Amino acid sequence: MGLYDRDYARGNSYAYETTSRSDSQIISFVKETYKLFAASMLAGAAGAYVGVPMAGTIHAMFLPLMLLEIGLLIGLHFVKHKPGINLMVMFSFVFMTGLMLAPLLARTLGMSGGGTIIGNAFAMTSVVFGAMSFYAIKTTTDFTSYTKPLMIALLVVVGFSIVNMFLGNPMLSVIISGAVVMLFSILVIYDTQNIMQGAYETPIDGAIALYLDFLNIFTALLQLFGIFGNNDD
């Protein structure tokens, strides 16, 4: 799940806050970041499209595929300055996140009105992401200083998510999904401001941060809409 990968890019944001960049360099950095983010969205969608027909196989191989996904993310950290290879690893990772989302998508499609549920979740995610991005640009509040409380909140959510993997409590699932939506909505603001300040080391760092924000919000909303929108007994 993207939730467990979210630390990747944030670690670089405050490590490079003091990097001196001119206004023109920051503008170029922002443009490149959002181009990569858009391309990542397409690659993730391609992974999901390929994965849905073989959702059962992906579910059965969840652990090795998850380890591969994490391995690609870690590997990206070491090759992000190597042209060509960095993009290949980045898109491989993003494609894998789409594959890993396929079982949830397939399960939702199997519900009554499943296609509508997925469409609504994506539309709501886009609205939330766009609104938070706009707010990040317009607000005078500096969310980049909230690294520590956001990290603590993330660890708490991850901890409860792991616990609920064993408990399988539906009510706790709802609470966790709601918390994920709220937390990653704030992280959209946090990451957007870091990108606008040129705080990330590379555009790939910023693009992956935004992509994981979007992915986690979408996944959480899809789970919530699936729970409340499933009328099958």
Model-derived regions: residue spans:
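A hydrophobic alpha-helical transmembrane-helix feature that marks the membrane cores
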Residues: M1-D233
